[in-house]
């Protein structure tokens, strides 16, 4: 029960923080810089705008993937070990999925352009990346005791 509470609090917290930051940019916030711009972009695809050609079906594919991941984590008992990173992952994923349904694309706002143009991203993306790194580190460097 404690693991589920941690998971839920982290997921809800990430979702709320993500949506509040995105609201700032949807309301016109902009900050230009020499290496990083904080400006509104809508990503119709996934990372690096891949799969944008799927169009309106992408949100349904992502909803199924999120549901599948959630089912797998809960049914296999992984939540006990990975409650916090799973919360990061699901909270970020739901934040971006919400954008697809409400704004027809993910609201991105951090644009790196120092020396080269990097993908534009958001807080939810960072939460997802942190979750994946955290889980990989735990799996490979701190495997569960048999």
Swiss-Prot record:
Keyword match Repressor: no
EC number of this enzyme: 3.4.23.36
Active-site residue numbers: 108, 125
Coiled coil: none
Keyword terms of this UniProt record: Aspartyl protease, Cell inner membrane, Cell membrane, Hydrolase, Membrane, Protease, Transmembrane, Transmembrane helix
Keyword Transport: no
Any one cellular-component term (Gene Ontology): plasma membrane
GO biological process, any: proteolysis
Membrane topology: Multi-pass membrane protein
Residue spans crossing the bilayer: 6-26, 50-70, 82-104, 123-143
Pathway entry: Protein modification; lipoprotein biosynthesis (signal peptide cleavage)
Matches recorded under InterPro entries: Peptidase_A8
GO MF terms held by the record: aspartic-type endopeptidase activity
Main location: membrane
Location in the cell: Cell inner membrane
Biological function: This protein specifically catalyzes the removal of signal peptides from prolipoproteins.
Family as reported in the entry's similarity comment: Belongs to the peptidase A8 family.
Protein's name according to its UniProt entry: Lipoprotein signal peptidase
Gene: lspA
